[in-house]
């Protein structure tokens, strides 16, 4: 059975890579020059490729650290020595873009290993389910598209998933080192390095919580009723747990590689004067709480085979009626957050090359009241996401929610790329869905990818004040 699964995996990976190579060829023919953010990334990588590493050679418009460029040089330079290619060829746009295609192969393999590790292997979860889940996430539209451009997404996901895998296998020093590599691609990836530490802490808290529950059971204390009472008990338990020096010492000994990484990050922020390098004018942090609601909607859209069903809607409505006071409070708080904390970035309104421009224009700008009318849908999506993660411990859920808030809420710009990593972490940790739902999900992703690539490659346009060809993209 294991050998057969290996054949299935090899076939899925080979077919995906073949299709990706064909798409890469189409991209290379259509895009001879750097496009969008590539106008910053590609020249910087080419300077590194030529051995010009001094700070005077750094483009101040770049806001991320040089992880992508350093890895690219580490890949293409040995290739030039082995193949005898000239520097002009090895540092070309096509070769540098191909580095991300290599990252996509690594991501496919890491996703498969993560599904094998995260999901319990039993008769109920077949090899087909694991491989279909891997294939589906590997072609997740928002991530898959950027495998063909010289962006940081593919490498960022690779090192973050690798760090998560090493964490699950208990190799925490390697995990922290890989977390640092992820940070070098995108500074906010430090949150997902902290997530690995949080995973360890959640495990230990769960063990202690089980002992606590067993004591309560033996003392025959009345069980708590309702989620708020349960949450209050959990928070009280965490407070008591954190007050114990013995527990803190044990947690530090477990998580010290991540603690060192976080201390290095804080030192970087102090020395740099902020998390962003280069141009900070367009990357101002703020409390943009509706980003959580946008993530819930994004997740509900891309995971609709698992989150949307008539049964789920009926269950949700029944729960709303049963706990109408609590849901009324949640609704009022959500409306308040939408009212007071909605921010509209200048790029969202000005750049009509991104899909988010049209989502905002045709949904949110249709009428002032629309953003409030969507609140019930946000609440349903949030509940459906939480319900799909109920197999995980409450401590894991708390830790994931904290990391989700930290990675999305400070972002002023509505950008689907910011949702890639939290979505993948979420999708990895829900129970393996039935094959029929996975096939439906894969089919929908394939359609979305086809439409996205077709529009990007064929439906070009020009701005009135520019002769450059513009394209629609995520």
Swiss-Prot record:
GO MF annotation: an example: dolichyl pyrophosphate Glc2Man9GlcNAc2 alpha-1,2-glucosyltransferase activity
Sorted UniProt keywords: Endoplasmic reticulum, Glycosyltransferase, Membrane, Transferase, Transmembrane, Transmembrane helix
Topological domains annotated Cytoplasmic: 1-6, 86-97, 148-150, 197-256, 305-317, 387-392, 458-473
Pathways involved: Protein modification; protein glycosylation
Principal location listed in the UniProt entry: endoplasmic reticulum
Transmembrane segments: 7-27, 65-85, 98-118, 127-147, 151-171, 176-196, 257-277, 284-304, 318-338, 366-386, 393-413, 437-457
Signal peptide: none
EC number: 2.4.1.256
Superkingdom: Eukaryota
Keyword Nucleotidyltransferase part of the UniProt annotation: no
Catalysed reaction equations from the record: an alpha-D-Glc-(1->3)-alpha-D-Glc-(1->3)-alpha-D-Man-(1->2)-alpha-D-Man-(1->2)-alpha-D-Man-(1->3)-[alpha-D-Man-(1->2)-alpha-D-Man-(1->3)-[alpha-D-Man-(1->2)-alpha-D-Man-(1->6)]-alpha-D-Man-(1->6)]-beta-D-Man-(1->4)-beta-D-GlcNAc-(1->4)-alpha-D-GlcNAc-diphospho-di-trans,poly-cis-dolichol + a di-trans,poly-cis-dolichyl beta-D-glucosyl phosphate = a alpha-D-Glc-(1->2)-alpha-D-Glc-(1->3)-alpha-D-Glc-(1->3)-alpha-D-Man-(1->2)-alpha-D-Man-(1->2)-alpha-D-Man-(1->3)-[alpha-D-Man-(1->2)-alpha-D-Man-(1->3)-[alpha-D-Man-(1->2)-alpha-D-Man-(1->6)]-alpha-D-Man-(1->6)]-beta-D-Man-(1->4)-beta-D-GlcNAc-(1->4)-alpha-D-GlcNAc-diphospho-di-trans,poly-cis-dolichol + a di-trans,poly-cis-dolichyl phosphate + H(+)
Gene Ontology CC: endoplasmic reticulum membrane
GO process terms (BP): auditory receptor cell development; dolichol-linked oligosaccharide biosynthetic process; potassium ion transmembrane transport; protein N-linked glycosylation; sensory perception of sound
Cellular localization per UniProt: Endoplasmic reticulum membrane
Residue spans, topological domain Extracellular: 28-64, 119-126, 172-175, 278-283, 339-365, 414-436
Membrane topology reported for the UniProt record: Multi-pass membrane protein
Known role: Dol-P-Glc:Glc(2)Man(9)GlcNAc(2)-PP-Dol alpha-1,2-glucosyltransferase that operates in the biosynthetic pathway of dolichol-linked oligosaccharides, the glycan precursors employed in protein asparagine (N)-glycosylation. The assembly of dolichol-linked oligosaccharides begins on the cytosolic side of the endoplasmic reticulum membrane and finishes in its lumen. The sequential addition of sugars to dolichol pyrophosphate produces dolichol-linked oligosaccharides containing fourteen sugars, including two GlcNAcs, nine mannoses and three glucoses.
Protein family per UniProt: Belongs to the ALG10 glucosyltransferase family.
Subunit structure: Interacts with KCNH1; may regulate KCNH1, possibly by regulating its N-glycosylation. Interacts with KCNH2; may reduce KCNH2 sensitivity to classic proarrhythmic drug blockade, possibly by regulating its N-glycosylation.
Protein's UniProt name: Dol-P-Glc:Glc(2)Man(9)GlcNAc(2)-PP-Dol alpha-1,2-glucosyltransferase
Species of origin: Mus musculus (Mouse)
Organism taxonomic ancestry: Eukaryota, Metazoa, Chordata, Craniata, Vertebrata
Underlying gene: Alg10b
């Amino acid at each position: 059975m294991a050998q057969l699964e290996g054949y299935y995996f090899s076939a899925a990976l080979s077919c995906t890579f073949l299709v990706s190579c064909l798409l890469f060829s189409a991209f290379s023919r259509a895009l001879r020059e750097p496009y969008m953010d590539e106008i910053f990334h590609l020249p910087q990588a080419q300077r590194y490729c030529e051995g010009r590493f001094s700070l005077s050679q750094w483009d101040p418009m770049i806001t991320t650290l040089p992880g992508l460029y350093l890895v690219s040089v580490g890949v293409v330079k040995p290739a030039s020595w082995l193949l005898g290619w000239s520097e002009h060829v090895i540092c070309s746009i096509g070769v540098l873009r191909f580095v991300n295609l290599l990252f996509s192969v690594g991501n496919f393999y890491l996703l498969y290993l993560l599904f094998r590790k995260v999901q319990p292997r039993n008769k109920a979860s077949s090899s087909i389910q694991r491989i279909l889940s891997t294939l589906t996430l590997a072609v997740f539209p928002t991530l898959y598209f950027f495998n063909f451009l010289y962006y940081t997404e593919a490498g960022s996901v690779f090192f973050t998933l690798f760090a998560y895998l090493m964490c699950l296998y208990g190799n925490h020093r390697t995990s922290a080192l890989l977390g640092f590599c992820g940070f070098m691609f995108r500074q906010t990836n430090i949150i997902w390095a902290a997530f690995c530490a949080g995973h360890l802490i959640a495990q230990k808290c769960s063990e202690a919580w089980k002992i606590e529950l067993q004591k309560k059971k033996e003392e025959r204390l009345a069980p708590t009723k309702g989620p708020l009472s349960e949450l209050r008990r959990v928070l009280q338990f965490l407070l008591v747990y954190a007050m114990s020096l013995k527990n803190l010492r044990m947690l530090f000994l477990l998580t010290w590689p991540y603690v060192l990484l976080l201390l290095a990050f804080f030192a970087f922020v102090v020395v740099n004067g902020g998390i962003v390098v280069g141009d900070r004018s367009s990357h101002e942090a703020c409390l943009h709480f509706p980003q959580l609601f946008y993530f819930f909607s994004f997740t509900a859209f891309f995971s609709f085979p698992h989150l949307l069903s008539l049964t789920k809607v009926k269950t949700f409505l029944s729960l709303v009626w049963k706990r109408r006071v609590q849901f009324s409070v949640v609704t009022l708080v959500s409306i308040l957050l939408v009212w007071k904390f909605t921010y509209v970035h200048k790029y969202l309104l000005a750049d009509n090359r991104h899909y988010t421009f049209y989502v905002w224009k045709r949904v949110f700008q249709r009428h002032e009241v629309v953003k409030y009318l969507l609140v019930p849908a946000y609440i349903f999506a949030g509940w459906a996401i939480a319900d799909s993660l109920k197999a995980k411990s409450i401590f894991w859920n708390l830790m994931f929610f904290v990391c989700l808030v930290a990675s999305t809420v400070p972002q002023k710009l509505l950008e689907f790329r910011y949702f890639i990593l939290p979505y993948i972490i979420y999708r990895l940790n829900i129970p393996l869905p039935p094959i029929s739902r996975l096939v439906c999900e894969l089919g929908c992703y394939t359609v979305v990818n086809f439409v996205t690539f077709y529009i990007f490659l064929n439906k070009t346009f020009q701005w009135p004040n520019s002769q450059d060809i513009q394209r629609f993209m995520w």
